[in-house]
Amino acid sequence: MYVELVDETGQVPSEIIEQTKEVLAFAAKKLDLKESTEMSVTFVDNARSHELNLQYRETDRPTDVISLEYKPDESEFFFDEDMELPEELLEEMDPFIGELFISIDKAAEQAADYGHSIEREYGWLAVHGFLHINGYDHYTPEEESEMFALQEEILTAYGLTR
């Protein structure tokens, strides 16, 4: 999987950037995503996170991670509006699945609050957002149980334990 990483803050250590790429590639293998899959991750500060959270979620505060899932639109590729294509074909034509915005301020706060390493927190946020992009959610107790168990399984197997 290809992950484009952007550090808008200029403060994220190169080790965290590499770890983020690696843990997302690891998670992609766990979900059996194609190697051609692409996504982006942008590290932002709380001010930018607040702005994005307001824009996309209509929530007036900063947040730790924002996940924007991308679904290819048939109209981008074909002129015949009546033509329906299998989702697999659309995914092959446009392998971009979404983007994450991770707040470095929230990552630092939460690592301290939860008493684990900053590496673990960045990994947690990246995998959490990645799972959202891939259809997982936590609106119900059942969804939360499934998503958080998978998230913990990925992080533990990768080596980011508490």
Swiss-Prot record:
Q: Which residues cross the membrane?
A: none
BP term (GO), one: rRNA processing
Q: Which SUPFAM superfamilies match?
A: Metalloproteases ('zincins'), catalytic domain (SSF55486)
Among PROSITE patterns, the record links this protein to: UPF0054
GO terms for MF: metalloendopeptidase activity; RNA endonuclease activity; zinc ion binding
Matches recorded under InterPro entries:
MetalPrtase_cat_dom_sf_prd (IPR023091), YbeY (IPR002036), YbeY_CS (IPR020549)
Which cofactors?
Answer: Zn(2+)
Keyword set includes Lipoprotein: no
- Provide the E.C. number(s) assigned to this enzyme: 3.1.-.-
Q: Which family does it belong to?
A: Belongs to the endoribonuclease YbeY family.
Return the protein name. Endoribonuclease YbeY
